[in-house]
Swiss-Prot record:
<dbReference type="Pfam" id="PF05448">
    <property type="entry name" value="AXE1"/>
</dbReference>
<protein>
    <recommendedName>
        <fullName>Cephalosporin-C deacetylase</fullName>
        <ecNumber>3.1.1.41</ecNumber>
        <ecNumber>3.1.1.72</ecNumber>
    </recommendedName>
</protein>
<dbReference type="GO" id="GO:0047739">
    <property type="term" value="F:cephalosporin-C deacetylase activity"/>
</dbReference>
<comment type="function">
    <text>Esterase that removed acetyl groups from a number of O-acetylated small substrates, such as acetylated xylose, short xylooligosaccharides and cephalosporin C. Has no activity towards polymeric acetylated xylan. Cannot cleave amide linkages.</text>
</comment>
<keyword id="KW-0624">Polysaccharide degradation</keyword>
<dbReference type="GO" id="GO:0052689">
    <property type="term" value="F:carboxylic ester hydrolase activity"/>
</dbReference>
<feature type="active site" description="Charge relay system">
    <location>
        <position position="269"/>
    </location>
</feature>
<comment type="similarity">
    <text>Belongs to the carbohydrate esterase 7 family.</text>
</comment>
<feature type="binding site">
    <location>
        <position position="91"/>
    </location>
    <ligand>
        <name>substrate</name>
    </ligand>
</feature>
<dbReference type="GO" id="GO:0005737">
    <property type="term" value="C:cytoplasm"/>
</dbReference>
<dbReference type="InterPro" id="IPR039069">
    <property type="entry name" value="CE7"/>
</dbReference>
<dbReference type="GO" id="GO:0030245">
    <property type="term" value="P:cellulose catabolic process"/>
</dbReference>
<feature type="active site" description="Charge relay system">
    <location>
        <position position="298"/>
    </location>
</feature>
<keyword id="KW-0378">Hydrolase</keyword>
<dbReference type="GO" id="GO:0046555">
    <property type="term" value="F:acetylxylan esterase activity"/>
</dbReference>
<dbReference type="InterPro" id="IPR029058">
    <property type="entry name" value="AB_hydrolase_fold"/>
</dbReference>
<keyword id="KW-0119">Carbohydrate metabolism</keyword>
Length: 318
């Protein structure tokens, strides 16, 4: 195995100090209050999809900054209420064709919404970047916590849960969240910022332990941050940017999660280095389990899909 991060025995105890600023909790309290001022106004448009036993819709709702967020919603074609899953996709990694993932979950009995992250697909992005940014979204608005791109994204993830839980066909007491990479980070963030989810599954979560990530990640998108620092050589700029990131580090949000969590990581993951995933995992203070795949990188891990199905069956159907 090509080892580029810490050995497994060190990873298991890797728990860096949290970097949350003093006003961390207040920031998120006020952010959620801002979100609450926006009426969701969900809109469902039927979609003709070639599968029996499921109904499919294009779901759109209003979120933070009045952005119109959209995605695919698939529901079992039988009487509810049904358990539900909200799924978040990876960084710039969603295509309209991924509708089949939501259909697959619906065929397993879950009303499922796949949120399309603002700006990365067909969801509207109303955030601004007054100081410019590197290619991609990682540094958009990075010099101010109030304008940072992921403030809107995290709140969009929360709003998705609020919308789904309001539907008559959904059992609001049996809703789970899941996603991989960026989607894994959003899974932890949503479970930390909302009391709606009852279970969370995060595949190799991104957006964690930024201070280490920019030193050890070998592939994008963490490296967008490094690129921004190269172009903006001021030490003050780096200090301010890292302070902003601390508000969005899922390592700092982890202890707010109160529901069971299942997580995965491959030990040769060059995108979300294992240490950054363990950093978030080791700060969780809830019932948790981390599946380690020694010979996998940042990729689809077949065995974990079965683990995920079993986990949601236990916590949302059991």
């Amino acid at each position: 195995m090509q080892l580029f991060d810490l050995p497994l025995d060190q990873l298991q105890t890797y728990k860096p100090e949290k970097t949350a600023p003093k006003d961390f909790s207040e920031f998120w309290k006020l952010s959620l209050e801002e979100l609450a001022k926006v009426q969701a106004e969900p809109d469902l448009q039927p979609v003709d999809y070639p599968a029996d036993g499921v109904k499919v819709y294009r779901l759109t709702y209003k979120s933070f900054g009045n952005a119109r967020i959209t995605g695919w919603y698939a529901v079992p074609d039988k009487e509810g209420p049904h358990p539900a899953i909200v799924k978040y996709h990876g960084y710039n990694a969603s295509y309209d064709g991924e509708i089949h993932e939501m259909v697959n979950w619906a065929l397993h009995g879950y009303a499922t919404f796949g949120m399309l992250v603002r700006g990365q697909q067909s969801s509207e992005d109303t955030s601004i970047s007054p100081h410019g940014h590197a290619l991609g979204w990682m540094t958009k608005g990075i010099l101010d916590k109030d304008t940072y791109y992921y403030r809107g994204v995290y709140l969009d993830a929360v709003r998705a849960l609020e919308v789904i839980s309001s539907f008559d066909e959904v059992d609001e007491t049996r809703i789970g969240v899941t996603g991989g990479s960026q989607g894994g980070g959003l899974t932890i963030a949503a479970a930390a910022l909302s009391d709606i989810p009852k279970a969370a599954v995060a595949d190799y979560p991104y957006l964690s332990n930024f201070e280490r990530a920019i030193d050890v990640a070998l592939e994008q998108p963490y490296l967008e941050i490094n690129s921004f620092f190269r172009r903006n050589g001021s030490p003050e700029t780096e200090v301010q940017a890292m302070k902003t990131l601390s508000y969005f580090d899922i390592m700092n949000l982890a202890d707010r999660v109160k529901v069971p969590v299942l997580m995965s990581i491959g030990l040769i993951d060059k995108v979300t280095p294992p240490s950054t995933v363990f950093a978030a995992y080791n700060h969780l203070e809830t019932k948790k389990e981390l599946k380690v795949y020694r010979y996998f990188g940042h990729e689809y891990i077949p065995a974990f899909q079965t683990e995920k199905l079993a986990f949601f069956k236990q916590h949302l159907k059991g």
